A protein has these predicted regions:
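Core catalytic lobe of class I
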Residues: 1-315, 343
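PRPP-dependent phosphoribosyltransferase catalytic core
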Residues: 314-343
């Protein structure tokens, strides 16, 4: 496997000093407490969404690496600002077989599966900067009646929340993402009949939601430049809609992408914009088809994607390159992006 090499520059969590600011950044307030600072920052943010960003925020770097989420030793400690990921489902999704010996989603024992996930969360906690967080998109595991003689649910999100405390992470209020479920896979190949008979005693509540867990590494708030704040702010309508515990305006991703458990780029994009700044480094240790990396390109963040299935690396590469070309054509925000693939 190649060393991380030139991509090592991604891992400096200290914001670079921006070049001389073009309009409209000339009107930046000196501090958050300057007269009219919030209004000025919001106005600048709205204008900069349609303009090229200043250096160094005008260029991003993205690394897709063949590797295991349980071993991120090649990433320096406290170098990642945000983790956005969706770990494999326990023993239900049809993941590829080439990495079956290491693929978490193919572990047959639930407690052993949780133990292996703990190793990944421990590595994420190590590489996160103090105060950084993990946004984990995960759903309950539905076990169909024909698989075990009875219908039951493994509360995977709740188990992750409880066990994350063992690796030093704090739980924050999660988001309930209401979506249209991909029933065939999530129910182990089921159909509408999986949900039970139409009369009440045999009914089963439809599973059309996932949890977005918020796991935070203890630490204070980061000091960032006023330029970063201006480029990264949410507008008031976005804040009103996004900072709620239930989301219902983003649909689940199509399985036609070629991955058994994709999640939409719009979901990753929103989480990145909510919990990171322009120029930050975002990690996805379970990269899959590359939705987090695509969202990072789109939002002017750097990214590292780690994936254990070779076939998904090619898929992620194609999607990221397509997004890089699209962003370059638009000529706004971080219009220059570079991709490195390491196997």
């Amino acid at each position: 496997m190649n060393a991380i090499g030139p991509a090592l520059s991604l891992f400096d969590p200290t914001p670079a000093v921006a070049a001389r600011s073009p309009d409209p950044l000339r009107d930046l307030p000196e501090t958050d407490n300057s007269p009219g600072a919030p209004e000025r920052l919001l106005r600048i943010n709205a204008e900069m969404r349609a303009r090229p960003w200043p250096a160094p925020y005008d260029a991003t770097r993205h690394v897709i690496r063949f590797g295991d989420a349980r071993d991120l030793s090649w990433i320096p400690s406290e170098s990642v600002h945000l983790v956005v990921t969706s770990p494999p489902y326990f023993n239900l999704k049809p993941y590829e077989s080439e990495a079956s010996g290491r693929q978490l989603g193919r572990i047959g024992d639930y407690e052993a599966f949780l133990g292996e996930l703990d190793k990944a969360w421990s590595e994420c906690a190590r590489v996160l900067v103090p105060g950084g967080r993990i946004c984990c998109v995960i759903g309950d595991v539905l076990v169909p009646r024909r698989a075990g003689g009875r219908h039951w649910v493994l509360p995977l999100p709740a188990d992750i929340q409880v066990r994350s405390r063992r690796v030093g992470l704090d739980n924050l209020t999660p988001i309930l993402w209401f979506k249209i479920a991909n029933r065939t896979n999530e129910a182990g190949g089921g159909s509408a009949g999986f949900y039970g008979k139409p009369y009440q005693p045999g009914a089963v509540i439809k599973n059309d939601h996932e949890h977005i867990l918020m796991l935070r590494k203890p630490g204070g708030y980061r000091q960032t430049s006023m330029v970063q704040k201006a480029l990264s702010m949410m507008q008031r309508d976005e804040m009103d809609a996004w900072m709620r515990p239930v989301w219902s305006d983003i649909r689940g991703a199509s399985l036609r992408q070629g991955h058994p458990a994709p999640y939409p780029v719009e979901l990753a994009e929103r989480l990145i914009r909510m919990f990171s700044f322009a120029g930050d480094l975002v990690l996805d240790p379970f990269a899959g088809s590359g939705s987090t990396a695509v969202a990072a390109v789109r939002t002017g963040r750097n990214s590292i994607s780690v994936e254990i299935e070779n076939s998904y690396i090619g898929m992620a590469r194609g999607r990221v390159l397509k997004e890089i070309a699209n962003v370059a054509r638009c000529g706004v925000q971080a219009a220059t992006a570079h991709l490195t693939v390491e196997r």
